[in-house]
Structures are given as C-alpha cells and as structure tokens.
C-alpha cells in the first residue's frame, strides 16, 4: 500500500542550491525531485501557495483549505530552507505553521479519526551548498556533536524538537549543565540533510514513523 505524504514548504524560496545546474531552482524543484524518486503508489500532497494572505482567515477557514490534503496523510515532511520564514510577517499569517499544527492534531471526519502524523524535517542546502544556516556539524571539538539552530525556525517547529519527556545526554565534560548534548531520538521532528535523505529516504521516513509510534514519549506542541 502506498504512503500518503504531505509536504510543507516555502514555494517561492530561491535561496537554495541549484538542482541539475538550474540556477532558477526554488524549493518547489526539490519537492519535484523527491516526487520523481518515490515508489509507484506513493502519493504526495503539497502545501498551500504561500502568496495568499491569511490575516483575515479564521481557524475554520484555514482548516477547510487544508483538511483534504492532511487528513488522509500519515507523514508530513517539512522542507527547511534558508528563507522559509517571513521575518516581518506574523507566524499566524503564514501557511507552514498551520500545516504543521494540523498535521499534529487528531482529527475526525465523517466518523473516522486520523491520528497525529509522523513529522520529518528535510534541510535543504542554501545557494552556497551549505547547511550551516541550520546545522552546525562538529560544534564541539571533543564529542563532535551537532548543533541545530532551532531559533531560526517557526515556533511550532522549534517546540517539537528536543521535546522528549525523559531525555538522555552524553557525558562530554566540555558542556555545561544547561547546555548538555542530547542522545537518541530526542525530537519528535527528526532533522536530516537533503544530501543524506534523497538517496535513502525510505530509511528516514521509517525513522519518523517509528518516532510517531512512540509519540507518547514526547510533549507535542500543536498550536500556532
């Protein structure tokens, strides 16, 4: 049986590395690249066009626009890109936070209930083929840990990272008590670089599904 995947992304963000030598590449091209590699039977629903003004919409109106795309999906992939977040616009007036919010809610339609989706954040390279805007590799010279710059994300996305209820940490003495390094699957929203994801996407989708099966171990934040 094919997977039903919802993809949330910033349509118009061109601050990404060119695909196949195309210097007008946008995030949408990365979505198309993934779609071309999925198995027959897998189905993708894409997020809303980001040019639409949400400021006058009520919650119910937003849900009406999203419900058919999200309700039947089992996993939501969020494409993280450098300019995904409009800095001078309220988060409530942007589509991505709402798409994440509804992906996390248990929803009922026509007597059938859909549980919270698995979530996976796929981090796209910026125009310089770098992931440093979000992922800092080897941030500690002793334990070679990775730092995720979650402060750059939408609030709902940030709050669903490092949100495991009973965290475990490594024993690196180079980190203070308030800056300990998490181990294991510490985030409900797992992050992966595009370069690692695209040729092994089945593995990472399964990781997200496994986390979802243990969602009670995480504090889920569902509000925009």
UniProtKB/Swiss-Prot annotation:
It is found in: Cytoplasm. Keywords: Antiviral defense, Cytoplasm, Hydrolase, NAD. Its EC number is 3.2.2.-. One of its GO terms (biological process) is defense response to virus. InterPro entries: ThsB__TIR-like_domain. One of its GO terms (molecular function) is hydrolase activity. GO terms for cellular component: cytoplasm. Activated upon phage infection. It comes from the Bacteria. Its main location: cytoplasm. One of 2 TIR-like protein components of the Thoeris antiviral defense system, composed of ThsA, TIR1 (thsB1) and TIR2 (thsB2). Phage infection activates this protein; by 70 minutes post-infection with phage SPO1, TIR1 generates a signal molecule that activates the NAD(+) hydrolase activity of ThsA (tested with B.cereus). The signal is similar to cyclic ADP-D-ribose, but how it differs is unknown. Expression of Thoeris in B.subtilis (strain BEST7003) confers resistance to phages phi29, phi3T, SPBeta, SBSphi11, SBSphi13, SBSphiJ, SPO1 and SPR but not SBSphiC. Homodimer. Belongs to the Thoeris B TIR-like family. This is Putative cyclic ADP-D-ribose synthase TIR1.
């Amino acid at each position: 049986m094919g997977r039903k995947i919802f993809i949330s992304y910033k349509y118009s963000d061109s601050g990404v590395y060119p695909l196949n030598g195309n210097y007008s590449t946008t995030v949408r091209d990365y979505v198309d690249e993934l779609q071309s590699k999925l198995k027959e039977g897998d189905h993708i629903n894409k997020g809303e066009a980001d040019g639409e003004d949400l400021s006058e919409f009520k919650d119910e109106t937003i849900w009406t626009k999203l419900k058919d795309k999200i309700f039947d999906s089992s996993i939501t992939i969020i494409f993280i890109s450098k300019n995904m977040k409009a800095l001078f616009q309220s988060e409530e007036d942007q589509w991505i936070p709402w798409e994440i919010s509804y992906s996390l809610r248990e929803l009922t339609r026509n007597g059938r209930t859909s549980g919270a989706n698995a979530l996976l954040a796929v981090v796209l390279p910026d125009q310089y083929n770098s992931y440093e805007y979000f992922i800092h590799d080897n941030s500690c010279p002793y334990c070679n840990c990775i730092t995720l710059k979650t402060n750059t994300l939408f609030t709902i996305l940030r709050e669903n990272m490092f949100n495991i209820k009973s965290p475990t940490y490594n024993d690196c003495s180079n980190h203070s008590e308030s800056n300990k390094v998490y181990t294991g699957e510490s985030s409900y929203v797992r992050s992966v670089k595009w370069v690692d994801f695209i040729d092994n996407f089945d593995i990472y989708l399964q990781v997200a599904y496994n986390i979802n099966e243990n969602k009670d171990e995480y504090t889920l934040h569902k509000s925009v």
